[in-house]
Amino acid sequence: MICFPNAKINLGLNVVSKRPDGYHNIETIFYPIPVRDALEIVASDRTCFTQTGIPVDAPQEKNLVIKALNALKTRYEIPPLEIHLLKAIPFGAGLGGGSADAAFMLKLVNDFCGLDIHPDELEAIASTIGADCPFFIRNTPVFATGTGNQFEPVDLSLKDYYLCLVKPDVAVSTPEAYSMVTPAAPETSLKEIIRLPVSEWKERMVNDFERSVFPRHPVIERIKDTLYEGGALYAAMSGSGSSVFGLFEKPTHFKEQSLFSDCFLWEGQLS
């Protein structure tokens, strides 16, 4: 049985306040996009895991697919499985690829083994793996608050817009992203901004992390500028980076123009 875990982008990100536990409260919009890994499981006489595609520099036991399987094993009887992950979503990009793999693993094993686990329980299990992991269980647009772990569904469709996603060969650490951000409640909530036409987002929707990341990694800012120069209605860094996306009314041709040739590049229409 096979499934295709998809990435997400952050539409805006406001760092609202610092918490007593040292973490930060944020607000952002998670929106699913059709940039996908492939995850397959088959019955086997022993559990084994293999991975191809984009290399991930992490030991197997720390892979979130394995963490998802182990989380299920503490609650249910799971037979031995042969697992293969084809990695196509860039990691360290603010796209939630690892969390998507884990959430889709929970759903895949649930279906494969006929466990009939309710989505609410799958979300609860996913929450033990990562803050944004539960989002991928239902995989629909949400207004995320708290540490990015509290979700409220939003009525938002970007169907028929064109997406260009660019990820340079740059890594951004979370402490680095927060380093120059002063937490503050936004004047206008993202829930209000997304009700406006996309063409009005540029002047109203911000990602607070850009003010920390851009001075340290100017290549990321240049990508955003290039997307706007290419006709983007809205462009922004996703999460803490380092990927940048642009939303367009028409198909983009950055690959044909040999722009971003040293970056991961995905262009396509949203559905």
From Swiss-Prot:
Entry's family note: Belongs to the GHMP kinase family. IspE subfamily.
Its job: Catalyzes the phosphorylation of the position 2 hydroxy group of 4-diphosphocytidyl-2C-methyl-D-erythritol.
Keyword rRNA-binding: no
Enzyme Commission no: 2.7.1.148
Coiled-coil blocks: none
Protein name, UniProt field: 4-diphosphocytidyl-2-C-methyl-D-erythritol kinase
Gene name linked to the record: ispE
Pathway connected to this protein: Isoprenoid biosynthesis; isopentenyl diphosphate biosynthesis via DXP pathway; isopentenyl diphosphate from 1-deoxy-D-xylulose 5-phosphate: step 3/6
InterPro entries: GHMP_kinase_C_dom, GHMP_kinase_C_sf, GHMP_kinase_N_dom, IspE, Ribosomal_Su5_D2-typ_SF, Ribsml_uS5_D2-typ_fold_subgr
GO molecular function: 4-(cytidine 5'-diphospho)-2-C-methyl-D-erythritol kinase activity; ATP binding
Gene3D superfamilies documented for this protein: 3.30.230.10, GHMP kinase, C-terminal domain
UniProt: ATP binding residues: 90-100
Organism: Parabacteroides distasonis (strain ATCC 8503 / DSM 20701 / CIP 104284 / JCM 5825 / NCTC 11152)
Stored Pfam families: GHMP_kinases_C, GHMP_kinases_N
Reaction(s) catalysed by this chain's protein: 4-CDP-2-C-methyl-D-erythritol + ATP = 4-CDP-2-C-methyl-D-erythritol 2-phosphate + ADP + H(+)
Active site: 8, 132
Gene Ontology terms: biological process: isopentenyl diphosphate biosynthetic process, methylerythritol 4-phosphate pathway; terpenoid biosynthetic process
Xref: PANTHER family: 4-DIPHOSPHOCYTIDYL-2-C-METHYL-D-ERYTHRITOL KINASE, CHLOROPLASTIC
The entry's keywords: ATP-binding, Isoprene biosynthesis, Kinase, Nucleotide-binding, Transferase
